[in-house]
Every structure is written in C-alpha cells, then in structure tokens.
Amino acid sequence: MCASVFFIIIYMFYIHYSHKSVLLNEAIQSLNIKATGMYIDGTFGSGGHSKLILSQLNKRGRLLAIDKDLLAVKIGKHIAEQDDRFTIIHSSFSKMINHVKNIGLIGSVDGILLDLGISTFQINDCSRGFSFMQDGLLDMRMDISSGISAAEWLSKASQENITWVLKNFGEERFAKNIAKILVSKRRYTPIIRSIVLSKLICDAIPHRNMNKHPATKSFLAIRMFINNELEEIMQVLKDALIILSPRGRLVVISFNSLEDRLVKYFIREHSCALSIPPKLPLTNNQIFSKYKNKCQLKNIGKLTPSKQEIKRNIRARSAILRCAEKLAI
C-alpha cells in the first residue's frame, strides 16, 4: 500500500471519530432528497454530509462535492474511486456555477448544501494556524495552494486596515487596540505563529468575557478576510438561483452572525415574504407575475441544534441552518 493511501485511510479513521458534522440529519432532511436526484455538497470537509446524501440516492442519483482544502479533496477522491455516483472537485463553492455549466446541469440541480463552518481536522492541524489554542505557522488559508497567508498579510497591512478587518469581519470592539499592538510588535519580530498572535490579542483586550477566549473574534475576522469568505458566500447564493431546478432546495449552515445575516437577508430578499401579506386570495402564478423580480424562493425556515447535540459537540452552539426552496413557476 502506498504511503498516500495509507495516510488517507488513517486520516479518515481519525476524522470518523473526532469530527462531528453539526446538524447532520437536519441538513439532509432539509434537502428533501429524491433517490434519483442531482445534489451538490459545496463544502465536502470530512465527508459526513456527502456520505449521508449518497446513502439516500439510488444508482441514478448523483452527488458533486466541492472543497478548497486539498486534504479534503484527497479524502473525497478516495470515496469517488469506490462510488461512481460521486465526484469531487478542488475549487471554491463561489465557482460552483462554472462546474455545473461544464456538466450541462444548469437549472437541473435538486439541492445545494453549504456547511460554512471550519472542520475539526483543520482546527486541530497546527500547521494551518486556525487555532488560537495551539502553536503553529500562521497560515489560515483554506486553500494552501493560492493566496497569501495570514502571516504575510499581518506583515504588510496598515494599522487602519487591520482595525477595519477586525471590526467589520469579527465585530471586535477592541479592534483599534489590537491593531496598534500588532503593528508595534512586528517592527521588532514578525508575527508568524498562531500562539504569538493569540497572546498579543489577549494583551490588547482590557475586559474579557469569561465564556469566550479573547482571540476568538480576531482569529475569525482574519480567517474570513484571508479567504474572502463573505464575498464567496454572496456569489454562491446568487448563483444558486440559476443552478437549482424548480423545487430544488438550498440548505446553509452558518456559524457566526455575519454569515447568518447574509443568508437570512438573501432568502428574504428573494422570497415573497417581505412584500406580500399572508392569506391573500391569489395563486402562486398571480403572485409571481406581480412580484417576479423578488419571488424566486420559498423560505422553508431555520433550525438550531438541540441541547443534546450542543452537549455532545460544543461547536454546535452557534450553528443556524436555513433552508429555502426555488419556486416551481
């Protein structure tokens, strides 16, 4: 057995027992899966959602998975070798529409799933720099084959730019204090390790929330900025309206307020709920003819984890699942 295959098998064993997909069953139920359907898992990760989707498809069903993380793609390719219903692509979900066009399935996809959270194996891999609790190189890129690392950005960004990122992406009230300390520190020593960044942030915050690590918001902000996460989410949401078939489902799991706000307002903007009072004596066709620019989605609703799931997996506490269905008009 070659070393790479052995590594993947060991790693799959590790993630099977360490990574818990949040709202796993709820997400798959929300997709309302048809056995012969075509589905897209836009964030393959450790493959938990993809495996459950595949278990509900028959021989004619298909699943396309996408991930920016090269290790996730390696794991996915191992599954693809054993199941010809499954394909995985190394890409960002913001480019999903290009891949769907390439296979001629625009307007024919029955469901899109996006799990916007960072995976356990990414957090636990010290070399990635995502964790403020472990020491490692400060990278933070989802795709290590492109873009600049967090360390590179911190070495060049102005104090004003760092402040803006921490405030707007992390909603960090002490953004100015943190930016000032980071710029002062880098004059003498490059900030290239996650534990160093974490300590500097802690030193900059005068009042601490005992229930949350002081570096939580700043690490989130830098990660989201480095990976262009909000713009990519906005792009895939817009494209989903074109990709989905009539009655196709869009299911998104968010883990912070900025992501959830984007998803919530997108669904509201493209559904009829904002502009049409309930119980009007009108058919769907009549409503659509009057409000066709807005009425493209039906808001199915939102779900949050149970107390039992949060107890089993603390990562679940901030998760919100939102689901919408493309109108069949």
From Swiss-Prot:
GO biological process entries? rRNA base methylation
In the UniProt record, does the keyword rRNA processing occur? yes
Reactions listed under catalytic activity: cytidine(1402) in 16S rRNA + S-adenosyl-L-methionine = N(4)-methylcytidine(1402) in 16S rRNA + S-adenosyl-L-homocysteine + H(+)
Q: What is its EC number?
A: 2.1.1.199
Q: Which SUPFAM superfamilies match?
A: Putative methyltransferase TM0872, insert domain (SSF81799), S-adenosyl-L-methionine-dependent methyltransferases (SSF53335)
Give one Pfam family: Methyltransf_5
Record-linked InterPro entries? RsmH, SAM-dep_MeTrfase_MraW_recog, SAM-dependent_MTases_sf
Q: Where in the cell is it found?
A: Cytoplasm
Domain of life where this protein originates: Bacteria
One GO term of the cellular component aspect?
cytoplasm
Q: Name one GO molecular function term.
A: rRNA (cytosine-N4-)-methyltransferase activity
Indicate which residues the UniProt annotation says bind S-adenosyl-L-methionine: G47, G48, H49, D67, F93, D115, Q122
Keywords attached to this Swiss-Prot or TrEMBL record, sorted alphabetically, are: Cytoplasm, Methyltransferase, rRNA processing, S-adenosyl-L-methionine, Transferase
Keyword rRNA processing among record annotations: yes
Q: Which family does it belong to?
A: Belongs to the methyltransferase superfamily. RsmH family.
Query: Which PANTHER family does UniProt cross-reference here?
Result: 12S RRNA N4-METHYLCYTIDINE METHYLTRANSFERASE, S-ADENOSYL-METHYLTRANSFERASE MRAW
Biological role? Specifically methylates the N4 position of cytidine in position 1402 (C1402) of 16S rRNA.
Under what name is this protein listed?
Answer: Ribosomal RNA small subunit methyltransferase H
Gene for this protein? rsmH
